[in-house]
Amino acid sequence: MCHARAARQATGEAEAAPRDNFSKAAGSKRVVGAAFETRAQRFLERAGLAPVARNVTVRGGEIDLVMRERDGTLVFVEVRARTSGRYGGAAASIGARKRMRLLHAAHLFWARMGGASACRFDVVAFEGGRLVWLRDAFRADETA
């Protein structure tokens, strides 16, 4: 599919707020998830990326954020949040099945955009109020 050259990992701080609960109620999860996506998008915009799309849904997959680097690279972003890293953390919660769904959705979106630009898959993870940006977190040609 598309690849961009590997880049370094960046971290930033995001303050935890008392209202940031991780309730299992479906509506509440959506609201909390949207808040974390907004935080991630703002962080990435401050880092120089431009927003392209948000919550792209296709049959069989969803992409939280689609951003564009200054060099034109299309960046598909998965946003994850966990209260702690106790069970491997937010980034570790993206298993092979989730990666396949992300890749499927990204491939369809990328093709719809003309398929000409390089792209990569990033993860913005929130763990206990700390934001971690994993650039080039995984690749389309990786297996489980």
UniProtKB/Swiss-Prot annotation:
InterPro entries: Restrct_endonuc-II-like, tRNA_endonuc-like_dom_sf, UPF0102_YraN-like. GO terms for molecular function: nucleic acid binding. It comes from the Bacteria. SUPFAM superfamilies: Restriction endonuclease-like. Residues 1-20 are annotated as: Disordered. Pfam families: UPF0102. Gene3D superfamilies: 3.40.1350.10. Belongs to the UPF0102 family. This is UPF0102 protein BTH_I3148.
